[in-house]
Amino acid sequence: MPQLNTTVWPTIIMSMLLALFLLMQLKTLNTHYHPPASPKLTNIKPHNNPWEHKWTKIYSLHSLPPQF
């Protein structure tokens, strides 16, 4: 049974990796990425909400009847 000649395999593998690297470089070179988003400046007006100044009960148990 003849032996398999593996002396050229490192050359083939290295040339394949080089070709894949070059193809990926060319592919990423031709892609156009969106520019980074800049924050939109808005005029924020302070709201005068009555619940900001006093404590309110934010929980209620719906299974219990209301207690006064």
Curated annotation (Swiss-Prot):
Keywords: Acetylation, ATP synthesis, CF(0), Hydrogen ion transport, Ion transport, Membrane, Mitochondrion, Transmembrane, Transmembrane helix, Transport. The modification N6-acetyllysine is found at residues 54, 57. It is found in: Mitochondrion membrane. GO terms for biological process: proton motive force-driven ATP synthesis. GO terms for molecular function: proton transmembrane transporter activity. One of its GO terms (cellular component) is proton-transporting ATP synthase complex. It is a single-pass membrane protein. The chain crosses the membrane at residues 8-24. The modification N6-succinyllysine is found at residue 54. InterPro entries: ATP8_mammal, ATP8_metazoa. Pfam families: ATP-synt_8 (PF00895). Its main location: mitochondrion. Belongs to the ATPase protein 8 family. Mitochondrial membrane ATP synthase (F(1)F(0) ATP synthase or Complex V) produces ATP from ADP in the presence of a proton gradient across the membrane which is generated by electron transport complexes of the respiratory chain. F-type ATPases consist of two structural domains, F(1) - containing the extramembraneous catalytic core and F(0) - containing the membrane proton channel, linked together by a central stalk and a peripheral stalk. During catalysis, ATP synthesis in the catalytic domain of F(1) is coupled via a rotary mechanism of the central stalk subunits to proton translocation. F-type ATPases have 2 components, CF(1) - the catalytic core - and CF(0) - the membrane proton channel. Component of an ATP synthase complex composed of ATP5PB, ATP5MC1, ATP5F1E, ATP5PD, ATP5ME, ATP5PF, ATP5MF, MT-ATP6, MT-ATP8, ATP5F1A, ATP5F1B, ATP5F1D, ATP5F1C, ATP5PO, ATP5MG, ATP5MK and ATP5MJ. Interacts with PRICKLE3. PANTHER family: ATP SYNTHASE PROTEIN 8. This is ATP synthase protein 8. It comes from Hylobates lar (Lar gibbon).
